[in-house]
Every structure is written in C-alpha cells, then in structure tokens.
C-alpha cells in the first residue's frame, strides 16, 4: 500500500510538472 501511495504521489508530481512546462 505504501508503494502504491508513493507511486500515486510521484505520478501527481509528474502531471503537475507537465502542467508547469506547458504553461511556461
């Protein structure tokens, strides 16, 4: 469960990063 939570957090950060790059 911990690994899944971590994976979800990383995925969210990646998606957020993509949004930031798209806005840049």
UniProtKB/Swiss-Prot annotation:
An annotated GO cellular component: mitochondrion
Annotated tissue distribution: Testis.
Major place of residence: mitochondrion
Family classification: Belongs to the chaperonin (HSP60) family.
Task performed by this protein: Implicated in mitochondrial protein import and macromolecular assembly. May facilitate the correct folding of imported proteins. May also prevent misfolding and promote the refolding and proper assembly of unfolded polypeptides generated under stress conditions in the mitochondrial matrix.
Subunit details: Forms a single seven-member ring complex, in tight association with the p63 protein.
Note: Shows ATPase activity.
Name the UniProt record assigns to this protein: 60 kDa chaperonin, mitochondrial
Higher taxonomy: Eukaryota, Metazoa, Ecdysozoa, Arthropoda, Hexapoda
């Amino acid at each position: 469960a911990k690994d899944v939570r971590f994976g979800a957090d990383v995925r969210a950060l990646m998606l957020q990063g993509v949004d930031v790059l798209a806005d840049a």
